Amino acid sequence: MVKLLLKDLGEKMILEGAIIYSNLLVLLALGLTLTYITTNVPNFAQGSYAIVGSYVALTLLKLFGICPYLSLPVLFVVGAIVGLITYLALKPLIKRNASVEILMIATLAIDLILLGVIGAYSEILSQIVGSTQAKFVFANLDFSLFGFKGILFVSTFVVILLLIGLYLLLYKTKFGIALRASMENPSLAQTMGIDVEKTRLFSWILSGALAGVAGGLLPFMQEIVPATGDLIIISIFAASIVGGLRHISGALIGGYIIGISESLITYYLASAFGTGFLVYGKVISLIIMIATLLIAPYGITGVDWKKLKRLLSTS
């Protein structure tokens, strides 16, 4: 009886963690998808954006005693600034119609710069507060509600708020209409007098802002080190690719598929074959991503479901 209760409790915690992780992946994958649609840049620095947010949240906590949840608006702004700086750095390459490979290498360089800056900053912060800040978690600062972690409710609320805000922006404002037009056909949008440059700038600012917020929430579920961004970028890309890099909704679909699959499959493999399998969680994401590329190269949102249904009905 006790073993059964412990098993049920363990599965509840894993499912709870899977939903939290998926919520954060949605925020990060959405930013990656936005910048890819508008500028055709596969941003390998997206994970490091989040870790910048994590360390800013840590700074506000250690120096000013501000709860990480209350620092989310600040992280939104800081992330937006990082996204803006990245776009300004990449803009000359984009203007010259640089290849995807060159843009990818440029974002990798930016990621390495951010990694170095974050590592150096963690050492400076350690000297200021008098204890090592190279790695940290916020789990002990979280609250609980109805037996669930507070981060579950906060991350879910942030995702819902984001989706409502994006819907209102894209479908209820003139700028949103211009943004959608720029995403679907930049050349035609420019011909029609739409300021494509402004929409590109906005997408990078929003991408950084979302990553900053995700970074503030990430320490509530896992330990953060300066290189954490380079670990989670695998799952971020997997989420965007599985959902479909050509549609914003793909980030939502892919985020939950990758987040839940990675968490649950890793848990059950570890339960069956030992805890050594816990370190291979990212391999699950890669396998799902590769399988998706083989079956549906443009992701789930890129599948012509009506055509597929007709083919299945005639066979």
Swiss-Prot record:
Family membership noted in the UniProt record: Belongs to the binding-protein-dependent transport system permease family. LivHM subfamily.
Keyword terms, alphabetized: Amino-acid transport, Cell membrane, Membrane, Transmembrane, Transmembrane helix, Transport
Function: Part of the binding-protein-dependent transport system for branched-chain amino acids. Probably responsible for the translocation of the substrates across the membrane.
Pfam families: BPD_transp_2
Topology relative to the membrane: Multi-pass membrane protein
Primary localization: membrane
Gene behind the chain: livH
Family matches, as CDD domains: TM_PBP1_LivH_like (cd06582)
GO cellular component term, pick one: plasma membrane
Gene Ontology terms: biological process: amino acid transport; transmembrane transport
Subcellular localization(s) per the UniProt record: Cell membrane
Gene Ontology molecular function, alphabetical: transmembrane transporter activity
Protein's name according to its UniProt entry: Probable branched-chain amino acid transport permease protein LivH
Record field: transmembrane: 14-34, 49-69, 70-90, 100-120, 150-170, 201-221, 224-244, 250-270, 283-303
